[in-house]
Every structure is written in C-alpha cells, then in structure tokens.
Amino acid sequence: MVERVEALADRKPNEDRPVPAITVPDITVLPRIPEPDPTVARMRAVRSLTTAPSGLEGEGFPVRRAFAGVDLGDLDPFVHLDQMGEVDYAPGEPKGTPWHPHRGFETVTYMIDGTFEHSDSNGGGGVITNGDTQWMTAGAGILHIEKPPEWLVVSGGLFHGFQLWVNLPAAQKWTPPRYQDLRATEVALASSPDGGALVRIIAGEVSGHKGPGSTYTPMTLVHATLSPGARLSLPWRADYNALVYAMAGHGTVGSEARPIQTGQLAVFGPGNTITVAAQQAQESRSPNLDILILGGRPIGEPVAWMGPFVMNTREEIMQAMADYQAGRLGTIPAIAAVHNAPTTIVETGQPRDGEPAH
C-alpha cells in the first residue's frame, strides 16, 4: 500500500525541490479516524511554541534540535528529538556517526527519505529506508554506529529523517538491549474523516489503530500529512503529554489555532484531543503540512543526562562512563574508531551545547 511520490533515481543532487513523504495511491480506501465527540472532547491548548535551532551532528550532517529550549518536565518521557538532514547530497557528501555508547533509554530512528545503516554490539542492526523505523533499546548499555551505506556515499542522494530519544523508568534502565526493525509496510495507516490528512501510526494507538512499535514507556508516535486547508482532530490520552513538531509547511495547532511552521515545536496543555490544521496556501517546496505528533505517560523521575547516557543520578552517570571506558558496554571491531566520552552532566534540565552523537 505504501509507495514513493517520485523515484529516487529521478532525483538530482542538491536540487531545490520538495523532499517527498511516504504516501498511498488512494487515501479514500483507508479507515477513517472519526471526529471527536463534542460532548466529551476537551481540546488541548498550546502551552509553548519554540523554534528549533540548526546544528551539525556526528561526522557533520545537518540537524534541527526540535527540543532545544524546552524544559525536560514538559517533554517527559522524551529527552531529545533531531530532524536530520532534509537534504539531497552530492556524491561524497553523506555523513553518519561513528561508534558510540548509550545507556538508560531508547533511540527511535525514522527515515522519511534516504537510507541509513545501523549496527550494534548486541548483534542488532540493518538498513532502514523510506518510511522504515529502527527502535533500539539501549537499556543496560550498548555500542552502535549509524551511517549511510557506501553506495549512497559514492552516488549521493536523499537524506531526511528523525531520531527520538525515549527515556526508560529506573526499573527498566537495566533491561537487556534489543533492536526492532519496523518496515514502512507495517505502519498503521488511517485518514481524517474528509480524507485530507494521512495519518501514519508508528507506535501506540489512535482510535483503535495500533502502530507496530513495542515500547517500554507507554507512548504514541504519529507522522501526519495534511493537504492544504485540511484539518485533523485526534483523540489523545489525557494521561499522556502532547507535542507537535512541524517538519514542513504552515498551519495552526491547538484549541486557539496558534500558527506553526517548519521547524517549530508546540507543547500542549491538558485535554484529550489534539487539533491541527494546514493553511490553504503553502510554499512550493513544502506543498503540505507534515508533522510529528508524539506523547507519552510522564515517568516523573529525576533525570541525569550526560551525552549518550540518560540515568537518574550523577552516580549512575559516572558509573556508565566508567563502564564504557572499561569496555563493559560491548565490543566493536578493532578497526572502528570510538568517540571520546563527553564530560558534561545535565541533571533534570535541558542539555547544554555539545550534545551527543546519536
């Protein structure tokens, strides 16, 4: 059912044309998400709206730091979100990240366009492309590497995706590492009542439609595309927080119809319904409003965050550093270069400059 809007082979490096999203041949055949019952719906208002700064990650690929400037208390159970790339690389340009450690959380890498390879010290890994998701539970500790395949480095091509960090409760931070390979064809698809919005449910549940991702932390992750003038209202669990990130386009969010545009994050207040609408006029490069909608049950525990480690206390962070330096987080091939461990600990707050590689 899932198809590309245009073939990768037809793209020329560095052309200023839209980066296509995953779509379907006929949205009218998809199940519809019903309009919320007005007698019970409580529309969430927008608590804050921030604009993501741009930076470089890993070996130099561009990112937008979607959560920058937002208090971790509003993000809980999430820690970090990067919009990666949205570029059409020339030959030799694609970049990745070298081998590096993680402990205490999960990384969720969602590829919209392009191809990324993953390998880890637990034997997990694979290649994700065009709507695929890799869900890596670092848990007690793991080493991994993420990079474009060699053929993409040689030829150049599209690269656009997201990486989300999902915190783990203290009781599950020591769970064994695992890897989930979620293909685009497994993602639950639905539409708005009028067919103007395509909803892809990667994890969690929306109106009975369940995504394939298996999560330790109760949460929902959705990628939605709204055509110009379309409106989408989603039922949203009242015990979850709610965030909307605009990856492309212009629209409004929340009960007060607050304007939102590319690179902005809306944090919602309490309620059980999220409302988003696309402006009728969109830019040629972004003909639709593309958004990530995410939320989960707050963990409500202290957070100590240093680079690639997310724990509950400073002592646990120091132990993670020691375990990494001693080789207790796994082994990698001798030819691979390992980054230096970072040196700044952030406790229950937003990370400082010099954030970790993914």
Q: Which residue ranges define each predicted feature?
A:
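Jelly-roll (double-stranded beta-helix
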Residues: 1-358
